[in-house]
Amino acid sequence: MGPVRLGTLLFILTVYGAWAGTPKEEEDDTERLPSKCEVCKLLSLELQEELSRTGRSREVLELGQVLDTGKRKRHIPYSVSETRLEEALENLCERILDYSVHAERKGSLRYAKGQSQTMATLKGLVQKGVKVDLGIPLELWDEPSVEVTFLKKQCETMLEQFEDVVGDWYFHHQEQPLQHFLCEGHVLPASETACLQETWTGKEKITDGQEKTEEEEQDQEEEEMTNTPVHSQHDPEDL
């Protein structure tokens, strides 16, 4: 049986715009960089998730020193402290490296944590003894892709640029979702906010209007890849 080439993956690659926010034709989504909307969306999701994790802490912080001034230390609940925000922001963009490119999904949904369906399919083929040639060693398959590395760098840039806005939200506007306050209110023009409305349902639509689970699609992809060896010049990091 011949090696499975990247061309077979074109059956499951989808379409979306590039960093400038300008939509492209559907044929062009196999190789692209994340949009500004996608960067802001993931930054907001990661920060709110981390703050949600620490929000129920009953710890009380003591601030200031008594010494000879006669002033008492201030007691501030950790849940509303600047310390909590600083700790949530620490290594925030590093956590973006936990994401993978799920090329079988549309738009901003292609960026999600965990192994992509496509990569799971390819590893399943390898376990079955099929020779899969991605042009890189097997041990490098799980390294962060160019897209994810770009996401992380742009996250750092955006966080530095809008640090004061994030602080304003934390101390004064937490009744609003951060995604709305930061991305829609400060980072993006109204014409570039479409990705914020995209949500993942866990199911994919197929042509006859029925729905297919990821497990069913993975089995079908393995069968297609096994039976249809094709050559391609596409970057393996799109997986």
Curated annotation (Swiss-Prot):
Record field: compositional bias (Basic and acidic residues)? 201-212
Q: What is its main location?
A: secreted
Entry GO terms, CC: extracellular region
PANTHER family from the entry? CTG4A-RELATED, PROTEIN CANOPY HOMOLOG 4
The reply to whether Secreted figures as a keyword in the UniProt entry is yes
Per the UniProt entry, the signal peptide is 1-20
Q: Which InterPro entries match?
A: DUF3456 (IPR021852)
Stretches for region Disordered: 199-239
Question: What is the recorded function of this protein according to its Swiss-Prot or TrEMBL entry?
Answer: Plays a role in the regulation of the cell surface expression of TLR4.
This chain's source organism reads Bos taurus
Family from the record: Belongs to the canopy family.
Alphabetized GO MF terms:
signaling receptor binding
Location in the cell reads: Secreted
Provide ranges: composition bias, Acidic residues.
213-225
Q: What is this protein called?
A: Protein canopy homolog 4
What cystine pairs are annotated? 37-195, 40-183, 93-155
Assembly and partners are described as: Interacts with TLR4.
Keywords for the protein's UniProt record, in alphabetical order: Disulfide bond, Secreted, Signal
